[in-house]
Amino acid sequence: MRNDQREVNQLRNINITTNYISHPEGSVLIEMGNTKVICNASIEDRVPPFMRGQGKGWITAEYAMLPRATAQRNIRESSKGKVSGRTMEIQRLIGRALRSVVDLDQIGERTVWIDCDVIQADGGTRTASITGAFVAMSLAFAKLVEAKTLKKTPIQDYLAAISVGVLTNGTEILDLNYEEDSEAAVDMNIVMTGEGEFVEIQGTGEEATFTPNQLQNMLKLGEEGIQQLVKIQKELLADKLLID
């Protein structure tokens, strides 16, 4: 039994509130246990300079954390005048993941801006951001289809992400909270499509190693967790996302 009484293969309580903020084309609040992230998707009718003239779109992401999203106050990165390496890594991960399931040629020369703002952190903020951002992006594209700006959604598959890890006693677990993450011997983030294909796997031994068997067990746990997340996404987007 884990520190929050969950089973090793049990997700935290999940809630995704759609249309959380009124201004963006797509907006959700995703809650995974005590981790809470606002994910907004905004459509801009232009692309970055390196994409101009190609007739295709782009998806990019920004990620930030409120100063008191954590137990101790963090200084805003805007006050520091630069984005940390961790933040840059997470932003690129979110953007890469979302682009993997979208036909950018169908968007035309438009940019989808994804803004993920962590308002409360208890582990798994980057994976929650990807899962929530997919829903926000889907809602944004649905609005373009409703307005007849796009003929159909450019989304080709569902997308979700989850963390898995190995505790110091050798137990593989799903969806780590902050306490588990800070004490884990191995930490891994997995991004997968609704069809069960891997998009990204980030795994690190925290002053430890892991066996091929443990790797397979973690991948299996992650796949099972992501299937549950995709099921929730499908229920939310039943009348918004029609994938050919």
From Swiss-Prot:
Keywords from the named record: Nucleotidyltransferase, RNA-binding, rRNA processing, Transferase, tRNA processing, tRNA-binding
EC number: 2.7.7.56
Catalytic activity: tRNA(n+1) + phosphate = tRNA(n) + a ribonucleoside 5'-diphosphate
GO biological process: rRNA catabolic process; rRNA processing; tRNA processing
Family matches, as InterPro entries: ExoRNase_PH_dom1, ExoRNase_PH_dom2, ExoRNase_PH_dom2_sf, PNPase/RNase_PH_dom_sf, Ribosomal_Su5_D2-typ_SF, RNase_PH, RNase_PH_bac-type, RNase_PH_CS
GO terms of molecular function: 3'-5'-RNA exonuclease activity; tRNA binding; tRNA nucleotidyltransferase activity
Keyword tRNA-binding: yes
SUPFAM superfamilies the UniProt entry points to: Ribonuclease PH domain 2-like, Ribosomal protein S5 domain 2-like
Coiled coil spans: none
Binding site for phosphate: 86, 124-126
Assembly and oligomerization: Homohexameric ring arranged as a trimer of dimers.
Protein family membership: Belongs to the RNase PH family.
Free-text function comment from the UniProt entry: Phosphorolytic 3'-5' exoribonuclease that plays an important role in tRNA 3'-end maturation. Removes nucleotide residues following the 3'-CCA terminus of tRNAs; can also add nucleotides to the ends of RNA molecules by using nucleoside diphosphates as substrates, but this may not be physiologically important. Probably plays a role in initiation of 16S rRNA degradation (leading to ribosome degradation) during starvation.
Protein known as: Ribonuclease PH
Gene field: rph
